[in-house]
Curated annotation (Swiss-Prot):
This is Cuticle protein AMP4. Pfam families: Chitin_bind_4. Residues 16-81 form the Chitin-binding type R&R domain. Keywords: Cuticle. One of its GO terms (cellular component) is chitin-based extracellular matrix. GO terms for molecular function: structural constituent of chitin-based larval cuticle. The lineage of its organism: Eukaryota, Metazoa, Ecdysozoa, Arthropoda, Crustacea. Arthrodial membrane. It comes from the Eukaryota. Residues 1-21 are annotated as: Disordered. The keyword Hydrolase does not apply.
Amino acid sequence: DRDAQTLTDERNDQGDGNFRYEFETSNGIYTQKTGTPGSEGQSNYQGSFRFPLEDGTIAEVTYIADENGFQPSSDLLPVGPPAPPHVQRLLEIAEDQRRQGITFD
């Protein structure tokens, strides 16, 4: 949209790895992100973005990115089927074995 206007453009960078920004336009595009230094040398991010779809609905994604990777959350993202009962039971057995100190080499 060539006629979109910037409504919000806020940026705060403390210079020590901590930052926050927020950006919004008149055509419904919005993003915000906060960053902090991580305990394992990584940067930790938490944020969201949204934008209008052609049908007029709004697509929105929230996320966390840290030592565990990028973890998005949105109604737009596909969800896999649940694990079958036998797989869930095997995972429970494996967790019990880990707690007992049992390892397999």
